[in-house]
C-alpha cells in the first residue's frame, strides 16, 4: 500500500512540474548539415523561391544582401520574424529569388517562404510557426475595378435632383 502511495506522489510531482513549464518552449532541433530545404512563398502578386541551408545567418535576396534589397528596417525585422520565433537567428543561410509585386508583397512572400522552409527543416517548429501565423498564406489581393464605377468601390457622385 505504501509503495502505491509513493508512486502516485511521484506521478503527481511530475505532472505539476510539466504543467509549470512555459507553453512556447522552443525545442532544440536536430540539424542535418548536408541538407538544403526549398519552399515557395506567395503574397499578392509576388512569388518567392527560398533555399534554406545550415550556415551563419546570411540572407541573400536576388543576388543582393538583405540590407541592400530592403533598405527599411521594419521590412528586415518582419523577414527575420520566423528566425526570432524559433530562436535560430544565426543557424541558417537563406538564398531567395523574388519576382512580381511590389516591395511589400515581396517581403510577405519571402516571410512565407522562409517559414515554410523552416517547417520542413525541423518539424518541431511547426506548432510555433503556426501559432505565430507565419505558415498561412495571406490571401488578400487588390480588388478589381468594376465597370460603371471609378474604382473598385468608389462610385460616381449621385444626385437626387
Swiss-Prot record:
Protein name, as recorded: Small ribosomal subunit protein uS9
Molecular-function GO terms, alphabetical: RNA binding; structural constituent of ribosome
BP terms from Gene Ontology: translation
GO cellular component, one term: cytosolic small ribosomal subunit
Keywords for the protein's UniProt record, in alphabetical order: Ribonucleoprotein, Ribosomal protein
Keyword Metal-binding: no
Disulphide connectivity of cysteines: none
Family listed: Belongs to the universal ribosomal protein uS9 family.
Gene: rpsI
